[in-house]
Amino acid sequence: ALQAGSRVPAMLNFSPGPAAIDAARRAAELKLVITSRQFVEKGRLQPLIGALAPSCTILYLEDVRSEIGPLAKLLALLGGIAPLAMSRLRFGRQGSADDEAVVLFTSGSEGLPKGVSLSHAAIESNRQQISSVIDFSREDVVLNALPLFHAFGLTAGCLLPLYSGVRQMLYPSPLHYRIVPEIAYDVNATILFGTDTFLAGYARMAHPYDFYSVRYIFAGAEAVKAETRRLYAEKFGLRILEGYGTTETAPARSINTPMANRPGSVGRALPGIETRLEKVAGIEEGGKLLVRGSNVMRGYYRAEAPGVLEPPVDGWYDTGDIVTLDDGFITISGRAKRFAKVGGEMVSLAAIETLAGEFWPHHATAAAAGPHERKGEEIGLVTERPDADLAEFQ
């Protein structure tokens, strides 16, 4: 509806707090915030609304409902019957595929959140890329509990089935580990999207028959643990197909498929996506991954330069990930910024965390690097396991 009126939706993640939200507002020059009084009350988001109110108009859906009269309802009915004709009649301008379709925001893990501008062409290209390697059909039912303010939940979990004519069921929270499997059973879901954390939670709580109708489970956003794969294979007889992407690529850029699946990798690059590896000093195997394709973003918006689009250089998006390639399969070693140089050797902090997760699967762990007089840097491991012993790694 917003796009039909030449408005660009910007999907705000409400969880980071007022400072991050205000940075996102400034970056994309947001003027209007659409929300719900009930949502604000249940989420206890009054401080966030208070921070936005001086610079944005706050529009509550409950107030809009009371203003919808018979004429508006008639126009909505006609719009459902002939959407293109009504759109041109009401708004005149016919949009371009290269127009901005949506603005999403990065997590801000490396500074203030950045706005990511995606075009209609980028989203449609990614849909076609995924559909060319995965057999979606109108007989499928997609269950998506991922938040729509993230690219995985919005473009992969919502827009992909919507534009493909595939039925879908949206659920507002991925954290309801008992409820989501029950919904999968009730709606006869055939396709499920999730992260390793959420999928592991569903598997622990689900009855073995809850996922009886599921054909494919797609995972992204974080590495899938071997324990999660084992649990789904033994309890449900299902494989998890792991993919890889970011907001900047709308989001998918590689995926394992039923016919080409290598656990531990994130699959092969999708059709139409160019890849190249840049060598990184100290890392002998693999390199930093850059990608280019029609699904790549229009550019960034930054809070430091509100409304100024910063396109990727020559169309190449620098992922910042160190990867290796084997027969086209991409394996992620870690973020370029998350390597430590110990005694002249580059060591992946992510690899250490993965190893710790295999030894202590039920306890959170994190690795960090700090200066060392002789070795240059040393690595520290923080864990919630009370009786942790590094001797277990030897």
Regions found by a protein language model. Name each.
Residues 1, 5, 13, 136, ...:
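Conserved AMP-binding
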Residues 2, 33, 100, 106-109, ...:
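Conserved S/T- and glycine-rich ATP-binding loop of Class I adenylate-forming
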Residues 3, 124-141, 149-191, 204-205:
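Conserved AMP-binding/adenylation subdomain of ANL enzymes
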Residues 4-77, 90, 188, 195, ...:
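Structural core segment of the AMP-binding/adenylate-forming
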Residues 33, 192, 287, 293, ...:
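AMP-binding/adenylate-forming catalytic core of the ANL superfamily
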Residues 58-105, 112, 132-141:
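Conserved pre-ATP/AMP-binding loop-to-beta segment of ANL
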Residues 61, 73-81, 166, 189-194, ...:
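Gly/Ser/Thr-rich phosphate-binding loop
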Residues 268-272, 281-313, 345-347:
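Conserved ATP/PPi-binding loop(s) of AMP-dependent carboxylate-activating enzymes
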